[in-house]
Amino acid sequence: MRLSLLVTLALTALIEAHTVMVYPGWRGNNLITNETFPYGMQWMYPCGGMGTSRNRTYWPTTGGAVSFQPGWFRGHLQAQLQINLGYGTDGPDGGPPNMSNIMVKPFMLLGPTNNPYPGTVCLPQVPLPAGANVSAGDRATIQVVEQAQHGASLYSCVDIIFAEPGDPRIPIVNETNCFNSTQFGFAQIYTVTTQEPSLDVIASTTTGSAPRYYSWAGWLPLVAGAIWMAL
């Protein structure tokens, strides 16, 4: 398992790949650029051009770990990350009908360089979406979204089957598949609220002193010129 992952990462480095999912699994290797995908597969919504996996991974009904490697492509000195969940198999190719259920709201990743870089991001306890009601045996898809600096997004997915916590079929989380590399920083995304201009302020700028100010401003160059000629 670890050997196959190392081989995948080596190939990734050669072809400037994108986001590699480490835990709980990966829908499949979509690190491909060819005539069919001239810009690369991972830019394609919802799962980077990969069809639904027939070999699903078990994941706890109470939420669990998600880890991935975000820096296998240029332009990710800063990136916006988000994790979503799609329920069921009623959508295209036996997958979810949509990926609109947010598990982790957008946050900023601060990378060490704008060139490709190694390193892992681990979220040890990703919660289920608000209002989620899942049972053991239900099927779903976890979607990791990485928005690059130029605005386009990369998509990677893992197809899961929910299982009760402690189920031996759930892959073990340990320090080799879920850790945060020290060269990464993180930041929250926030909004700035602007105040609507007051009508009183607008009125005060259209009457009274404002016209006189601009009137004097118009005369100032002429006055300055006259003083200079007198000297």
Curated annotation (Swiss-Prot):
Glycosylation site residues: N34, N55, N98, N133, N174, N180
Signal peptide residues on this chain, from the entry's feature table: 1-17
Protein localization: Cell membrane
GO CC field: plasma membrane; side of membrane
InterPro entries cross-referenced by the UniProt entry: BIM1-like, BIM1-like_dom
Disulphides: C47-C157, C122-C178
Residues where Cu(2+) binds: H18
Membrane topology: Lipid-anchor; GPI-anchor
Propeptide residue range(s): 203-231
Details of cofactor binding: Binds 1 copper ion per subunit.
Top-level taxon of the source organism: Eukaryota
Cofactors required: Cu(2+)
Keywords from the UniProt entry: Cell membrane, Copper, Disulfide bond, Glycoprotein, GPI-anchor, Lipoprotein, Membrane, Metal-binding, Signal
Keyword Glycoprotein: yes
GO molecular function, one term: metal ion binding
Residues bearing a lipid moiety (GPI-anchor amidated isoleucine): I202
Family statement: Belongs to the X325 family.
Function summary: Lytic polysaccharide monooxygenase-like protein that has diverged to biological functions other than polysaccharide degradation since it does not perform oxidative cleavage of polysaccharides. Acts as a cell surface-bound protein that functions in the copper-accumulation pathway. May also act as the major cell wall sensor that regulates MAP kinase-dependent hyphal anastomosis, the fusion of hyphal cells.
Name of the protein this chain belongs to: Lytic polysaccharide monooxygenase-like protein X325
